[in-house]
């Protein structure tokens, strides 16, 4: 999935076309980010106040799509809005032109007074409102997001009638554990690859990024959690954190970090 943001239908249509050309299966519009910079561009969570405009945007995106599904990520409201009143209205107006999948962060967003980080934790969760949306609109795909810290917690909410649950930070910080649980739930085999194999397969991608002017730490900072909960995790993080930001850092930094982990693990056997 490719997530995009904006409030100009023509620009979002063009972004959708580019996403389709790149091979994405899903193009998601962000109606949830509360940061000042995002608000200044008139997109993100502030658009919860403009459901008619969001409807125009997703209509333009659907018309531009050559196969990718158009989906929406939103909050339950912003600032002093009453979620039980405005969220159903928002969903109804945005879905009337054929968008049927909504990932709902079950918190309000405060557009001032809280940082984006605080907006992920401080506003109270309202899972029941998201469940009510699904019960009253069974034809829509409703996916819960926000505060889901374990795989079991996500499955519990799905089993109460939702179509899915989105785990964000936990999946980012401990991807292998989440992937293993997902394989068990969906009877798939994605986790048969070892972490070592995944890292090895990342190397050509990293090299291509470097060859086109990118920096190593732009990728490795998203790989820090690969050994979470395993021996060698600290060495992995420390090696990447200390070396990947350097000007001429290349794939050898990742290879050395992996070598350090394997040495640590072998010493424990």
Question: Residues of each region from the PLM?
Answer:
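Glycine-rich anion/phosphate-binding loops
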Residues: 1-24, 46-56, 84-88
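A cross-family glycoside hydrolase active-site/sugar-binding cleft signature
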Residues: 3-5, 30-32, 71-75, 103-105, ...
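Active-site-proximal loop/turn and secondary-structure-junction residues that shape catalytic pockets
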Residues: 6, 33-35, 76-80, 106-110, ...
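Conserved radical SAM core fold
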Residues: 9, 32-47, 108-113
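Non-cysteine beta-strand/loop elements that form the S-adenosyl-L-methionine
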Residues: 25-35, 96-109, 167-170
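Proteins enriched for Cys/Gly/acidic motifs involved in redox and nucleic-acid/cofactor modification
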Residues: 41-43, 51, 203
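Short glycine-enriched, charge-decorated loop/helix-capping segments at active-site entrances
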Residues: 42-48, 116-121, 185-186
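Alpha/beta catalytic cores of nucleotide-metabolism and tRNA/nucleoside-modifying enzymes
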Residues: 56-59, 63-65, 69, 78-80, ...
């Amino acid at each position: 999935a490719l997530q995009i943001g904006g409030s100009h239908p023509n620009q979002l249509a063009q972004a959708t076309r580019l996403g389709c050309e790149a091979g994405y299966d899903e193009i998601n519009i962000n109606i949830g980010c509360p940061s000042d910079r995002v608000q200044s561009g008139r997109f993100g969570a502030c658009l919860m106040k403009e459901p008619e405009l969001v409807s125009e945007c997703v209509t333009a995106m659907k018309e531009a799509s050559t196969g990718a599904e158009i989906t929406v990520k939103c909050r339950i409201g912003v600032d002093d809005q009453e979620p039980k009143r405005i969220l159903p209205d928002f969903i109804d107006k945005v879905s009337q032109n054929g968008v049927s999948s909504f990932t709902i962060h079950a918190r309000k967003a405060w557009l001032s007074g809280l940082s984006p980080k605080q907006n992920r934790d401080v506003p109270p969760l309202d899972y029941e409102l998201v469940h009510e949306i699904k019960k009253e609109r069974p034809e829509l795909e409703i996916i819960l997001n926000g505060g889901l810290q374990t795989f079991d917690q996500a499955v519990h909410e799905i089993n109460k009638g939702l179509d899915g649950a989105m785990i964000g930070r936990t999946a980012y910080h401990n991807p292998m554990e989440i992937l293993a649980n997902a394989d068990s739930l969906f009877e798939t085999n994605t986790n048969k690859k070892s972490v070592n194999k995944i890292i090895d397969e990342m190397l050509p991608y990293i090299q291509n990024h470097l060859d086109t002017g990118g920096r190593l730490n732009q990728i490795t900072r998203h790989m820090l959690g690969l050994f979470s909960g395993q021996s060698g995790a600290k060495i992995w993080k420390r090696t990447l954190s200390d070396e990947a930001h350097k000007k001429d850092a290349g794939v050898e930094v990742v290879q050395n970090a992996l070598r350090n982990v394997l040495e640590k693990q072998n010493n424990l056997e």
